[in-house]
Amino acid sequence: MNEFKRFEDRLTGLIESLSPSGRRRLSAELAKRLRQSQQRRVMAQKAPDGTPYAPRQQQSVRKKTGRVKRKMFAKLITSRFLHIRASPEQASMEFYGGKSPKIASVHQFGLSEENRKDGKKIDYPARPLLGFTGEDVQMIEEIILAHLER
């Protein structure tokens, strides 16, 4: 979160002068716009640093079952699983519901997991789902300044 240190220095006093309901509205707007940005980036199959995701492992030709043709994480980044929360103190985004937090953390950090069919250990490459891009930081600054001008 070091990239937000400059926000703290410049805007802390101004943000604290807002009423609690104003801060909650600001954090709700920030969370909503950040979720949209994350969803667009994940649908483009890109990490926050702009590199493309590692492709899925190839399945053998004989095993046509189990093939997945849609883009990775298409369902995981919907608002059903990617929840936002806003309060006067903070805005947060988290994966919620069923297996989605575990799936997201395995791919975010490139962990290994046991296959549920045959018990083999599978090493997943890191595919960061959440993170800040340069455009996200700029968007946050613009939203805060626009909200303070109202």
From Swiss-Prot:
Gene: S
Annotated region (Disordered), positions in chain: 32-66
Role summary: It is proposed that R and S are tail completion proteins that are essential for stable head joining.
Any Pfam family: Phage_tail_S
Protein name: Tail completion protein S
Top-level taxon: Viruses
